[in-house]
């Protein structure tokens, strides 16, 4: 099983600790699972830029609890803003960013994607989850809220 993380939106103190806590949890619950992060959020997902967490990192997560920000970087990319994704070179003309993201997850053999961010990040996670289900991709997307605005309204959405 391969589990991926991405952080998106604005930089916040909880991002690094969230990744550390997820790694610690998977170390206990699924020690054989492969863990990776998409570099710079949804941009990294679209471009296929990722980092596999080696065992040396998985065993030293305590450092992730000491620093804010995100060790895998953030970006503000909306998968539903096709024109912006094309303009920035994340997808080519005629491509659907949701499909590009879904196909990248499949190419990377990801079973579970954890997205960590605010309302836009979680809206994109819901859109991606809906797209995956609608097109019979066998993947799970889990959104982890990171917001000081209290603007992530639903804690559980069944699609």
Feature locations, PLM:
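Conserved small/polar residues in nucleotide/adenosyl-binding loops
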Residues: 157-159
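Short, ordered loop/turn segments at secondary-structure junctions
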Residues: 8-10, 38-44, 76-77, 118-121, ...
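Short, acidic/small-residue loops that bind anionic groups at enzyme active sites
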Residues: 129-154
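N-terminal phosphate-binding or glycine-rich loops at protein starts, especially the Walker A/P-loop
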Residues: 1-50
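Glycine-rich nucleotide/cofactor/substrate-binding loop typically near the N-terminus or early
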Residues: 32-108
